[in-house]
Design a protein with these regions (language model features):
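Alpha-helical transmembrane segments of multi-pass small-molecule/ion transporters
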Residues: 1-310
């Protein structure tokens, strides 16, 4: 129950950040289109800082075992959920924004603050493992889907700053190389912008929307149901059947981090990618807002379900 309360408090805090972005545009200080600059800063600067900084921890065999367990759970979920969402998209005739909003969770923006507040800073690394796995899918499948490109540009994927950051973080961890303290502090400071910056962008986009149309759009509620209820339930079933929880003494806590990453609202990165690649960013933002709003109720309930089932 305590974890559920902490979740509600954290999500409420994110909503206040969205409100700030909304007010900035409504008062005329900035325009909605100005959010594109912030989006690029988040995608190409803030997220890489978060990833590299997260891997700056002491190397131990136990740590490696825990990381591999979380990695296995993350890949397992991403692969199975991708197949499930792809099938649902075909049957339900969902467009690119809808399928990516259902599949991609807001782990990039939420998992770090959520894990920090709920479990402690020392557990953030494991959240970043899931985030890194999702990042690979996001910049391959996600980017290809949203941009409607027929082929993957492997050079852009391999040399993408986010992919490079994942590789750099892993290499630094396994080679036991620690960056100078001033560098780590800088990475940590910049990385702390991830939640506020992403939520402010969402608020700025909302300011130019017809909010009435968002709440009257039945399709948005349906997409939110798939993102916040169906995906988490399927994920919980997969984690339970996999038996991964029995591999480690802290298995339940480690898998909770993975589960927390899965049950978050739709990824705000989808909105940012839609802006960059010319898709429907306003619709993506509407789904993000609705799922974030409803997640105040669904996330605590899903955590309670996890604690009961696992």
């Amino acid at each position: 129950m305590e974890i559920s309360i902490l979740l509600m408090e954290q999500i409420a805090e994110l909503f206040l950040m969205i409100l700030m972005g909304y007010i900035i545009v409504k008062t005329g200080l900035l325009k909605g289109d100005d959010s594109k600059v912030i989006s690029k800063i988040v995608l190409y600067l803030v997220i890489p800082c978060v990833i590299i900084n997260a891997f700056q921890v002491d190397y131990t065999s136990e740590k490696v075992k825990e990381l591999l367990m979380v990695f296995a759970a993350s890949v397992l979920l991403q692969v199975i959920l991708l197949a499930a969402v792809w099938g649902a998209g075909k049957v339900l005739k969902l467009n690119e924004v809808e399928t990516t909003s259902i599949y991609y969770s807001n782990s990039g923006n939420l998992i770090v603050p959520l894990v920090t507040f709920i479990l402690g800073k020392e557990w953030v690394l494991y959240g970043c493992v899931f985030m890194s796995v999702q990042l690979v899918f996001l910049w391959t499948h996600g980017k290809n889907t949203i941009s409607r490109e027929g082929k993957w540009d492997w050079k852009k994927i391999v040399f993408n700053i986010n992919m490079i950051s994942v590789f750099a973080g892993v290499v630094l961890f396994f080679t036991r190389i620690r960056l100078p303290e001033i560098v780590n502090q800088t990475l940590s400071s910049v990385g702390s912008m991830i939640g506020p910056a992403s939520m402010i962008v969402t608020g700025m986009l909302i300011a130019e929307m017809n909010l009435k149309s968002i709440f009257e759009n039945v399709k948005v509620y349906f997409i939110s149901f798939l993102r916040l209820v169906v995906i988490p339930v399927i994920s919980l079933m997969i984690l339970k059947i996999s038996g991964l929880v029995n591999i480690h003494s802290d298995g339940k806590k480690l898998l909770l981090i993975v589960f927390l990453a899965v049950i978050t609202p739709s990824a705000s990165t989808i909105t940012q990618m839609c802006q960059v690649y010319g898709n429907d960013s306003k619709y993506a933002s509407a789904i993000n807002v609705m799922t974030t709003l409803l997640s105040i109720v669904t996330m605590p309930l899903m955590v309670l379900l996890y604690q009961t089932v696992m």
